[in-house]
Swiss-Prot record:
<feature type="binding site">
    <location>
        <begin position="477"/>
        <end position="480"/>
    </location>
    <ligand>
        <name>GTP</name>
    </ligand>
</feature>
<feature type="binding site">
    <location>
        <begin position="377"/>
        <end position="384"/>
    </location>
    <ligand>
        <name>GTP</name>
    </ligand>
</feature>
<dbReference type="Pfam" id="PF04760">
    <property type="entry name" value="IF2_N"/>
</dbReference>
<dbReference type="GO" id="GO:0097216">
    <property type="term" value="F:guanosine tetraphosphate binding"/>
</dbReference>
<dbReference type="InterPro" id="IPR009061">
    <property type="entry name" value="DNA-bd_dom_put_sf"/>
</dbReference>
<dbReference type="Pfam" id="PF22042">
    <property type="entry name" value="EF-G_D2"/>
</dbReference>
<keyword id="KW-0342">GTP-binding</keyword>
<dbReference type="Pfam" id="PF11987">
    <property type="entry name" value="IF-2"/>
</dbReference>
<feature type="compositionally biased region" description="Basic residues">
    <location>
        <begin position="249"/>
        <end position="260"/>
    </location>
</feature>
<comment type="function">
    <text>One of the essential components for the initiation of protein synthesis. Protects formylmethionyl-tRNA from spontaneous hydrolysis and promotes its binding to the 30S ribosomal subunits. Also involved in the hydrolysis of GTP during the formation of the 70S ribosomal complex.</text>
</comment>
<dbReference type="Pfam" id="PF03144">
    <property type="entry name" value="GTP_EFTU_D2"/>
</dbReference>
<keyword id="KW-0547">Nucleotide-binding</keyword>
<feature type="region of interest" description="G5">
    <location>
        <begin position="513"/>
        <end position="515"/>
    </location>
</feature>
<keyword id="KW-0963">Cytoplasm</keyword>
<feature type="compositionally biased region" description="Basic and acidic residues">
    <location>
        <begin position="199"/>
        <end position="209"/>
    </location>
</feature>
<dbReference type="InterPro" id="IPR009000">
    <property type="entry name" value="Transl_B-barrel_sf"/>
</dbReference>
<dbReference type="InterPro" id="IPR004161">
    <property type="entry name" value="EFTu-like_2"/>
</dbReference>
Length: 868
C-alpha cells in the first residue's frame, strides 16, 4: 500500500481524523496535521502500539461493573446411570464491564487447545473458570478463555454460593448480566462436551443432561429469560461467521430445553438465529422514498423508517402544522423528505390515464384543416362587431350591454376558405377565458381601436398569445372615424414588442372597419396566408379529441358542452370523456343551431348527453366503451379530491395568525348561480379580488343553472346574498324567498355585480374618525366660582369655541389635561359658542389647575367616509 495522508488513512480505517492523530502521537510519532504523509514503517509502529495497548487495556482499564460467581454441579459420564462415572464441576466466573467511547474491532482469538480429561473416581471435581464476552453499543466485556484443571476433592453436599459485587447499579448493567449468565451456562456445557471423548459422548442419554437443571436455575434472571418473561431481541440480518462465533460457540443454541420439553430440530435451528446485540449504523442510511401525489404523515414516516413524531417535528420547524393522519400534498412531502436527508422519488399514479391513451384508437389519415382563429382585444374595441360582419349576423346585439361574456365558437365559410373563430371577452374579469382561447387556437387576431390605442386588456391578450406561442395578426379597427390614428397604435404596440412588417418586424397589420367592411377581405387573406405557412393538418379517421370551450346547464336539454374538435371525427353515439364527466353523445348541434351527425377537426359543436357540466378548458376525448370512461372519470375525481383536501389542510404558522386576526374581519357570503361555466369562474374570481383585510367576499356556493329551493335554503342558513347571472329562480324558490324575506339579485352585465358588491363591502367597513380643531382660546386670567370652581377668562384667538365639546389644556405646547368644556359664558350669560376675537369665561369640568398663559384647544370628532 502506497504512502497516504493522515486524512486518507482515517477514512480507510473508518475513525475520526482527531482520534487517529491522538493514536499516532501516543505511538511516539509526531503528527499534527491531517495532510501529513504516513509511510509503511510508521503504519507498522502504529499497529504494534495498538496491539500492545489493546492487551494492556484489557487488564488496566477501569472497572465499572464486576461480577464474581462460583457454582458446583455434577455430570455423569458413561453408558448408563449405574456404570457411568460422576464428574464434579466447579464454575468460577468473573466479568468486567468497561465504558468505551468507540468499540474497536475485536481481534480474532484462536481457540485454545483443551487437554483431554482423565476419568477419575466419583469424588473427583473439575473447576472451570470462564469469562464471557458480550458486546453492546456502550459496554464491552473482557474475555478469558475457559481452562480445565483438576482441583481438590470437595464435599458433594456443598451448596452453590454466589458473591456479586456491583460498583454501579444501573438498569443498563442488569440487562448485560442477564445475557452474561446465559452465556456462562452455554460455555460450561460446551467445555464439558469437548472434554468428554467422542466414543463416550455418543453414549450419553439425553435424560442425564437434565441434571444441569439446578445450574440453569442459579439466577432468577436466567429462569425468567427461559420462561419467556424476557423476550430476546430478534436480529433479522444475516450474520457473518465471526459474529456467530462470538455469540454461540460450538454451533449450539443459547436456549436450553427444560425437562420434559421436546423441541424439533427445525425449531432449534430457528432459535440459533436469535441474538441479543444491536449494532448502531456507522453512517446515516439514505433511502429512496416514493412519493405519490398525496400521502399521509404516518405513511411518509413509514417509508423513511422513522417515527411519525419526527416527521411532524420537521414539518413544524418548516412552519407547517400537521397531525399523524393528515394528508399532505406531493410538494410538501418532497420538502420534508429532503430536509430529513433522504432522496425523494416522485411517482405519478396515472396508470389509468396511460391505459386510456393506449385504448384510444389512433387514425392514420391526415388532411388539411381550417385554422382556429381567436379574436382578442380590449372591451368595446369591436371584436364581436368584426365577427358579425364576417358572419353577416348580429351577435353583438344579443349580448347584454353589448359586451361579450361567453366564448363564442363559430365556423365560417368564406369565398377564400373555411375559418373557425373564437370570440373571447375583453373585460378584465375574463382573464381565464382568454387564456383558454389562446391555448386552443392557431392564430390570434388582436383588435385595437384606432381612436383608443393600446389598453390593459390589449397588453394581456399579447401576453396570452406569446405564452401560447401563437402568431398574431393586428387588426386596427374603427378606421372610418375621423380621429383614427393608426400610427399611434403601431407606436404603442412596438413598445410591447409587436413590430409591424413595414417596420421590419414579423407581425402583419391590417387597417379595417367592422362597421363599413373596409379591409375585411385583406384580413381574411392575411389569416389564410398565415395558416398556409403553419401547414395545419389533422387526423380525420381516428377517435375524436378536442377541448371544452364552454359549458352550461340547459333546462330542457340538460348539461350542454361546447366542444372544439381538434383531431379525429366526433360522431353521434360516441362515448365522450370530458374531465370528470362522461356520457354517450345524444345530439350534436352546430353553431348555426342545426343538428349534425358528426364533426371533424376545427369544427365547434354543442354536445348533449354528458353526466354533468364539465369544466371549461377540459380535454374531451372519445373512449371505446362506457366502462373505461367511468373508470377514468372516477379516478380523476378521487385524485382531485385528495389533492384539494391536502391543500386545504396545509395550514402554516402564518396562516394560524391570519385566522386569529380574520375572526375580527367581516365576511360577505354569496350564493352565485350563472348560465355558463366560464362566466361563473370569471364572476367568482372578480368578486374574490374585492376582499381586503377588513372585509372579505366568500362565494360559499356556485353553480350553473337556475336558482333552486336548496340555493335559497343555503342563503338563509349562511346569511348570504343570492345572485343570479342570466338565470332566474323557479316558482318554489321564489315563494320560499318571499316567505323568508330573502332578496334575489338578478344581473346580466358583470359590471353591475362588481359595483353592487363593492358598495355592500364599503358599507361593511368600520368607520374612521378624525379629530378636527374648531377653536383655540388663550387664558388671560383665572377666577374662582363657588359652584363650578376655577373659571378661565379667555380670548378666542382662532376658530370657534363651542359648548360641550371636548377640550385639551396646553401649557408650553404640552397637553396637560383632556376633558369636556362644562361652562361657557359671555358677560354672565350662558352661550352656545364664542367666535374669534371675543372674550369668554370657560369652566373645565373636574379641573382647577388652569393658569394664565395656558391654551384651551377645542376639537370635535368627525367620521370619515371610507372606500375600498
Amino acid at each position: 500500500m502506497a504512502d497516504v495522508t493522515v486524512k486518507q488513512l482515517a477514512q480507510v480505517v473508518g475513525i475520526p481524523v482527531e482520534r487517529l492523530l491522538n493514536q499516532l502521537q501516543e505511538a511516539g510519532l509526531s503528527f499534527t496535521d491531517d495532510q501529513q504523509t504516513v509511510n509503511e514503517e510508521q503504519k507498522r509502529i502504529l499497529l504494534n502500539h495498538l496491539k500492545g495497548s489493546s492487551n494492556r487495556d484489557i487488564s488496566a482499564a477501569p472497572e465499572r461493573i464486576t461480577l464474581r460467581r462460583k457454582s458446583m454441579s455434577q455430570v455423569t459420564v458413561g453408558h448408563d446411570m449405574h456404570s457411568g462415572k460422576t464428574v464434579n464441576i466447579e464454575v468460577r466466573k468473573k466479568k468486567t464491564f468497561i465504558k468505551r467511547s468507540a468499540i474497536p474491532e475485536q481481534a480474532e482469538i484462536e481457540e485454545p487447545v483443551v487437554p483431554p480429561v482423565v476419568e477419575e473416581p466419583v469424588h473427583e471435581e473439575i473447576t472451570v473458570v470462564s469469562e464471557v464476552s458480550a458486546e453492546t453499543p456502550e459496554l464491552k466485556e473482557t474475555e478469558e478463555h475457559p481452562v480445565i484443571e483438576p482441583v481438590a476433592e470437595l464435599d458433594e453436599t456443598v451448596k452453590e454460593e454466589e458473591k456479586i459485587s456491583l460498583e454501579e447499579n444501573t438498569a443498563e448493567s442488569q440487562d448485560e448480566l442477564t445475557h452474561a449468565n446465559t452465556d456462562v451456562i452455554e460455555n460450561l456445557v460446551d467445555v464439558v462436551e469437548e472434554a468428554i471423548p467422542a466414543s463416550k459422548k455418543e453414549e450419553v442419554k439425553p435424560e442425564k443432561v437434565s441434571k444441569k437443571k439446578h445450574l440453569e436455575q442459579t439466577d432468577s434472571d436466567i429462569s425468567e429469560f427461559k420462561k419467556g418473561k424476557k423476550k430476546p431481541k430478534y436480529h433479522t440480518f444475516e450474520h457473518d461467521e465471526e459474529e456467530q462465533e462470538l455469540h454461540r460457540r460450538g454451533g449450539r443454541s443459547k436456549f436450553k430445553k427444560k425437562k420434559g420439553t421436546e423441541k424439533s430440530d427445525k425449531y432449534r435451528e430457528a432459535e440459533e438465529t436469535l441474538t441479543h446485540g444491536f449494532a448502531l449504523p456507522t453512517a446515516p442510511i439514505v433511502r429512496e422514498v416514493l412519493i405519490p401525489e398525496t400521502i399521509t404523515v404516518a405513511e411518509l414516516a413509514k417509508r423513511m423508517s422513522v417515527k411519525a413524531a419526527e416527521v411532524i417535528k420537521v414539518m413544524m420547524s418548516l412552519g407547517a402544522m400537521a397531525t399523524i393522519n393528515q394528508v399532505i400534498d406531493q410538494e410538501t412531502s418532497v420538502i420534508v423528505v429532503e430536509e430529513m436527508g433522504h432522496k425523494p422519488v416522485i411517482i405519478k399514479e396515472d396508470a389509468v390515464e396511460t391505459g386510456l391513451g393506449e385504448a384510444i384508437s389512433k387514425g392514420t389519415k391526415t388532411e388539411g384543416r381550417a385554422p382556429v382563429v381567436t379574436i382578442m382585444g380590449h372591451v368595446d374595441h369591436g371584436k364581436t362587431s368584426l365577427l358579425d360582419y364576417i358572419r353577416r349576423t348580429k351577435v353583438a346585439a344579443g349580448e347584454a350591454g353589448g359586451i361579450t361574456q361567453h366564448i363564442g365558437a363559430y365556423h365560417v365559410s368564406t369565398p377564400k376558405g373555411n375559418i373557425t373563430f373564437l370570440d373571447t371577452p375583453g373585460h378584465a374579469a375574463f382573464t381565464a377565458m382568454r387564456a383558454r382561447g389562446a391555448q386552443a387556437t392557431d392564430i390570434v387576431i388582436l383588435i385595437v381601436a384606432a381612436d383608443d390605442g393600446v389598453k390593459p386588456q390589449t397588453i394581456e391578450a399579447i401576453q396570452h398569445a406569446k405564452a401560447a406561442k401563437v402568431p398574431i395578426i393586428v387588426a386596427i379597427n374603427k378606421m372610418d372615424k375621423p380621429d383614427a390614428d393608426p400610427e399611434r397604435v403601431m407606436n404603442e404596440l412596438s413598445v410591447q414588442e409587436v413590430i409591424p412588417e413595414a417596420w421590419g418586424g414579423d407581425t402583419m397589420f391590417v387597417n379595417i372597419s367592422a362597421k363599413s367592411g373596409m379591409g375585411i377581405d385583406d384580413l381574411l387573406d392575411a389569416i389564410l396566408l398565415q395558416s398556409e405557412v403553419l401547414e395545419l393538418k389533422a387526423v380525420t379517421d381516428g377517435a375524436a379529441k378536442g377541448v371544452v370551450i364552454e359549458s352550461r346547464l340547459d333546462k330542457g336539454r340538460g348539461p350542454v358542452a361546447t366542444v372544439l374538435v381538434q383531431s379525429g371525427t366526433l360522431h353521434k353515439g360516441d362515448i365522450l370523456l370530458a374531465g370528470f364527466q362522461y356520457g354517450r353523445v345524444r345530439a350534436l348541434v352546430s353553431d348555426n343551431g342545426d343538428l349534425v351527425d358528426s364533426a371533424g377537426p376545427s369544427i365547434p359543436v354543442e354536445v348533449l348527453g354528458l353526466s354533468a357540466i364539465p369544466h371549461a378548458g377540459d380535454e374531451a376525448v372519445v373512449v371505446p366503451d362506457e366502462k373505461k370512461a367511468r373508470e377514468v372519470a372516477l379516478f380523476r375525481q378521487g385524485r382531485f379530491r385528495d389533492v384539494k383536501l391536502a391543500r386545504r389542510q396545509k395550514t402554516s404558522i402564518e396562516g394560524i395568525m391570519e385566522n386569529m386576526t380574520a375572526t375580527e374581519s367581516k365576511v360577505l357570503n354569496i350564493v352565485l348561480k350563472a348560465d355558463v361555466q366560464g362566466s361563473l369562474e370569471a364572476i367568482s374570481d372578480a368578486l374574490t379580488k374585492l376582499s381586503t383585510d377588513e372585509v372579505k367576499v366568500e362565494v360559499i356556493s356556485s353553480g350553473v343553472g337556475g336558482i333552486t329551493e336548496s340555493d335559497v335554503h343555503l342563503a338563509i342558513a349562511s346569511n348570504a346574498i343570492l345572485i343570479g347571472f342570466n338565470v332566474r329562480a323557479d316558482g318554489t324558490a321564489k315563494r320560499l324567498a318571499e316567505q323568508e324575506s330573502v332578496s334575489i339579485h338578478y344581473y346580466s352585465v358583470i359590471y353591475d355585480i362588481v359595483d353592487q358588491i363593492k358598495g355592500a363591502l364599503t358599507g361593511m367597513l368600520a368607520p374612521q374618525f378624525k379629530e378636527e380643531i374648531v377653536g383655540i382660546a388663550e387664558v388671560r386670567d383665572v377666577f374662582k366660582s363657588p359652584k363650578i370652581g376655577a373659571i378661565a377668562g379667555c380670548m378666542v384667538i382662532e376658530g370657534v369655541v363651542k359648548r360641550n365639546n371636548p377640550i385639551r389644556v396646553l401649557r408650553s405646547n404640552v397637553v396637560i389635561y383632556e376633558g369636556t368644556l362644562e361652562s361657557l359664558r359671555r358677560f354672565k350669560d350662558d352661550v352656545l359658542e364664542v367666535r374669534q376675537g371675543f372674550e369668554c369665561g370657560i369652566g373645565v369640568k373636574n379641573y382647577n389647575d388652569v393658569k394664565p398663559g395656558d391654551l384651551i384647544e377645542v376639537f370635535e370628532t368627525v367620521e370619515i367616509k371610507r372606500d375600498l
